[in-house]
Amino acid sequence: NIANRINAVKDWLSLPEEQRPHMITFYMPEVDHEAHTYGPNDPHVEAAVKFVDSSVNALQATLATLNLPINYIFVSDHGMTKVDNDNTLGMPKAIDTAAFRVPWGDALIHLYAKEESKIQSTYDALKKDSLISVFQLDETPDYWHYKKKDDIYQRLGDLIVVPHLPKVFNFSTRKTTLGKHGFDNHHPDMRASFMAWGPAFKKGLIIDDFENVNVYPIVAKILGLDYNENNIDGKINVLNSILQPIPSTMKAAKHN
């Protein structure tokens, strides 16, 4: 119940200052759920967007009664695109599953070689398929951050196979959903949302696209948290210009 969730936030912010949370996250799954099920341009998604919009309005109106300097950051973690779920791609014939471990995927699949001698021949065979693109790690676009130097946890496959939209992979007998994400983050449909308002933010700005990792540094700055720039991906200079000057009296807490 959205009213109960909003009232819970109000109750938390009504606590004595020493007990009051300084950051609250509030996830709303409705748009994601409907867009996966029906595709991003369906009336069900429009209704879900209107529900979220009215809920944010209700949240703001409820919290305004507390007379606190509340900042709001409204984000989505990904975009959504409509795929061809009637004609999905199965396991490419060029992939020998005895020679590769292939976990499930739809927007891309990773091929983990059991036999390194099979990598090049499989790569060459997959390159001939007009419905997909195949990459060795050092061929992937820089902005994917999918190269060997980025793979500090050794999660990436020896080969990465990407279907050409609107195609997607489906290794199941069950029909896949109409809406998907996880594709190339330069694709317009993969763009996420960002809005921010409150006393910490300048008003009326329209800004250029940026990567979501850059939200963290401004949240930390607003909260007065210190952090090691070498330990995070985001950069404060990307969004710093949207912030009002932070009072010099604000004391930074250590955040390790």
Predicted region positions:
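Soluble non-cytosolic domains of exported or imported proteins
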Residues: 3, 43-50, 113-117, 209-213, ...
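Active-site neighborhoods of enzymes that stabilize oxyanions during catalysis
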Residues: 104-218
